UniProtKB/Swiss-Prot annotation:
Its cofactor is Mg(2+). It comes from Listeria monocytogenes serovar 1/2a (strain ATCC BAA-679 / EGD-e). PANTHER family: RIBONUCLEASE 3, RIBONUCLEASE III. It comes from the Bacteria. Residues 4-133 form the RNase III domain. It holds the Pfam family dsrm. Keywords: Cytoplasm, Endonuclease, Hydrolase, Magnesium, Metal-binding, mRNA processing, Nuclease, RNA-binding, rRNA processing, rRNA-binding, tRNA processing. Its EC number is 3.1.26.3. HAMAP family: RNase_III. PROSITE patterns: DS_RBD (PS50137), RNASE_3_1 (PS00517), RNASE_3_2 (PS50142). Mg(2+) binds at E46, D119, E122. InterPro entries: dsRBD_dom, RNase_III, RNase_III_dom, RNase_III_sf. Homodimer. This is Ribonuclease 3.
Length: 229
């Protein structure tokens, strides 16, 4: 059994077009180093998967919470499809082991980079939608995401920076600092990377479309790390 057969068995779906599945797990760095192979990266599938994920999650929230206000549903959806949550979902189904990376990106730790894993999860959703249709996407989410919604994991949408501050300052005074590490992407579609440092120790890193979102993402990762110590 090769890795793609293993992956299909793991997710519970057979792909009619296995090349589409491979593309979902192909980072641009791999394409750059294998130009003779005529492979495609996963960026277009990520674009599609992002929209499919928003639609399916929105539909689920709309039907599950018939009395919930639009504003609250919007916040809930944002918490479900944000980068830290997508990374959690990707890790739950062991997607990182199947990602095709260039040698440089691999050495730089790309396989565990949060933004990369979140992108792979979205690109897989895009590929699954194209190959199997929306119903199979819903079936997959019923296994990976919807149970967490049912358990109430996203009912309390929070300010993660405030929550982190409350957690670490319960017993003592501590110094919490946020650093913007850099930015990537064109001017119209920038992504910022941030880290949160508590008493000199890096507790979390994250990224977002704005500096504030990146800091919130870093704080959420730090909270998850503290909770699962």
């Amino acid at each position: 059994m090769n890795q793609w057969e293993e992956l299909q068995e793991s997710v519970g779906f057979d792909f009619k077009n296995v090349e589409l599945l491979k593309q979902a797990f192909t980072h641009s760095s791999y394409v750059n180093e294998h130009r003779r192979e005529n492979v495609k990266d996963n960026e277009r599938l990520e674009f599609l998967g992002d929209a499919v994920l928003e639609l399916t999650v929105s539909d689920y929230l709309f039907n599950k919470y018939p009395d919930m206000a639009e504003g609250h549903m919007t916040k809930m959806r944002a918490a479900i499809v944000c980068e830290p949550s997508l990374v959690e979902f990707a890790e739950a189904v062991h997607f990182s082991k199947y990602v095709r990376l260039g040698k440089g990106e691999e050495k730089a730790g790309g396989r565990t980079r949060p933004a990369l894993l979140a992108d792979v999860f979205e690109s897989f959703i895009g590929a699954l939608y194209l190959d199997n249709g929306i119903d199979k996407v819903v079936t997959f989410l019923e296994r990976v995401i919807f149970p967490k919604i049912d358990a109430g994991a996203y009912l309390q949408t929070v300010d993660y920076k405030t929550q982190l501050q409350e957690i670490v300052q319960r017993d003592r005074d501590v110094l919490i600092e946020y650093d913007i590490l850099g930015e990537t992407g064109p001017a119209h579609n920038k992504a910022f990377d941030a880290q949160v440092i508590v008493n000199g120790q890096v507790l979390g890193k994250g990224s977002g479309r704005t500096k504030k979102q990146a800091e919130q993402s870093a704080a959420q990762f730090a909270i998850n790390k503290l909770i699962h110590r």
